[in-house]
UniProtKB/Swiss-Prot annotation:
SUPFAM superfamilies tied to this protein: TolB, N-terminal domain (SSF52964), Tricorn protease N-terminal domain (SSF69304)
Biological processes annotated in GO: cell division; protein import
Pfam families (UniProt xref): PD40, TolB_N
One GO CC annotation: periplasmic space
NCBIfam families: propeller_TolB
Keyword Cell cycle: yes
Protein name stated in the entry: Tol-Pal system protein TolB
InterPro entries: 6-blade_b-propeller_TolB-like (IPR011042), PD40 (IPR011659), Tol-Pal_TolB (IPR014167), TolB_N (IPR007195)
Keyword terms: Cell cycle, Cell division, Periplasm, Signal
Stated role: Part of the Tol-Pal system, which plays a role in outer membrane invagination during cell division and is important for maintaining outer membrane integrity. TolB occupies a key intermediary position in the Tol-Pal system because it communicates directly with both membrane-embedded components, Pal in the outer membrane and TolA in the inner membrane.
Domain of life from the UniProt record: Bacteria
Signal peptide: 1-34
Underlying gene: tolB
């Protein structure tokens, strides 16, 4: 049984879209949520562009000590740093902390090689609502030049999302790329020696605001977001064998999709949200199938005695990348859903699997196995170039950020003594980060779409 807590007060238009995708789904019989995870940078930040995010200033006469104003700036700084594009300067190294644009002295920042800074203010109203404003400033000109600014009015519970939204605006202004800081991730958490050892969670991309949407005594696997961000498909063994289900996030309702004898797995929504691809073994070997989600009609896509699984749609809704051992060892192939024409895509080493196609269809992230190691690899579909991005032992389940800048994956450290955790890596492999948590094993991470409705 679920309790669905929805928004009750009118929010700005931009935040209404966010709020609908962030329903707080809480089990009535689960008294507390997990402690938030946090991101620890492990490689690559020094090569990024320096930027300073000044602690935001409180301008209210009724200062509320329950909110740390510095938290908003720190969230923005962390977002920009996590993007791999920016190196945010620690607060203790700032030459000065201006509170308004007219206080900015460009020569102070020039000495540090910093030409972009962020200023902001927080006004706390008597009704405990908040007005957040920011200025993105170019300090290479004298006087300093405002290149972007905005203001938001929200309740306290939305402050963290406002910070992420500001990060999105700053990131897009400076890079021309849509920010993905308001997105969510889903993953399976296994806690050993627990009555319900398997739980499906959703959280902010950075591990904050974790919410359990399903818990089970039996395994949960392979969560997949719908393109509109309203549903998640996943595999459950609650009935004693594998089943594919789709859960609506705003109601918690779960619909059984397929439950054939044998294996039912690897769900993947088409970009237009009209179809669901998956793998079944009802004929003996694993083959790909597609369901029309409106009619429920199922069509078999591959028809051979090999194992064909892990489908990932191309953005054209007409082609699917998948894993097949039809050549002897697992490799990545592409199949056209209308003609069923098949093309091999990967050639790196002897084994590649678990493909994830970028939202623009220009590259694939996959799992490469070679010489006893399992790494995340990238296949450039424009040039055919293949490259290893990580140096790991058991990296698995890669998921590309919806703006195609980062990859999220699960990993077990090389010493094999620690649990599986989540890690981030930039598309070029230069930036790496570890999402810290003190829970159990985290598996099957998947990134939400860019625009949650």
């Amino acid at each position: 049984m679920y309790l669905i807590i929805k928004k009750t007060h009118k929010l700005p238009h931009w935040l209404q879209k966010v709020s609908l995708s962030i329903m707080l789904i809480i089990f009535l019989w689960k008294p507390a949520l997990l402690a938030d995870m946090h991101i620890e940078i492990t490689c690559g930040v020094n090569a990024a562009h320096p930027i300073a995010v000044i602690p935001f200033t409180c301008v209210s006469n009724q200062y509320n000590k329950s909110i740390s104003i510095e938290d908003i700036a720190s969230i923005i700084a962390a977002d920009l740093r996590n993007s791999s594009k920016f190196n945010t300067i620690p607060v203790e190294y700032l030459p000065h902390k201006p509170t308004k644009v007219s206080d900015v002295i460009p020569t102070f920042w020039e000495k540090l090689g910093i030409n972009i800074i962020v200023l902001g203010t927080v006004h706390i109203n008597y009704d405990e609502s908040y007005i957040i404003s920011y200025h993105l400033i170019d300090t290479s000109s004298n006087p300093a030049l405002i290149i972007s600014e905005n203001q938001y009015s929200v309740e306290k519970k939305w402050l963290r999302y406002v910070a992420h939204a500001i990060s999105n605006e700053i990131f897009e202004k400076l890079t021309g790329i849509k920010g993905a800081f308001c997105t969510r991730i889903a993953y399976v958490l296994r806690i050993h020696n627990d009555h319900y050892p398997y739980e499906l969670y959703i959280s902010d991309y950075d591990g904050h605001n974790q919410i359990s949407i399903c818990r089970s005594t039996e395994p949960l696997m392979s969560p997949a977001w719908s393109p509109d961000g309203k549903k998640i498909a996943y595999v459950t063994f609650a009935s004693g064998h594998s089943e594919l289900v789709i859960q609506a996030l705003n109601t918690g309702l779960v619909n059984n999709i397929v439950s054939f004898p044998g294996h039912n797995g690897a769900p993947s929504f088409s970009p237009d949200c009209k179809k669901l691809a998956f793998s079944l073994s009802k004929t003996g070997s694993l083959n790909l199938y597609i369901m029309d989600l409106e009619s429920g009609e199922i069509t078999q896509l591959t028809k051979n005695r090999n194992n064909n699984t892990e489908p990932s749609w191309f953005p054209d809704n007409q082609n699917i990348a998948y894993t097949s051992d039809q050549g002897g060892s697992p490799q990545i192939y592409k199949i056209n859903v209308k003609t069923t024409e098949i093309q091999r895509l990967s050639w790196l080493h002897t084994s590649n699997q678990n493909p994830n196609v970028s939202s623009d269809g220009t590259f694939i992230i996959m799992v490469n196995r070679h010489q006893g190691k399992q790494n995340i690899a990238k296949l450039n579909l424009l040039t055919g170039q293949e490259e290893i991005l990580t140096d790991t032992l058991l990296a698995d389940s890669p998921s590309i950020a919806p703006n195609n800048t980062m990859v999220l994956y699960s990993n077990i450290n090389k010493d094999l003594t620690t649990k599986s955790n989540l890690e981030l890596i930039s598309i070029d492999g230069h930036f790496k980060a570890h999402i810290q948590g003190d829970q159990g094993d985290i598996r099957f991470p998947t990134w939400s779409p860019l625009h949650l409705e």
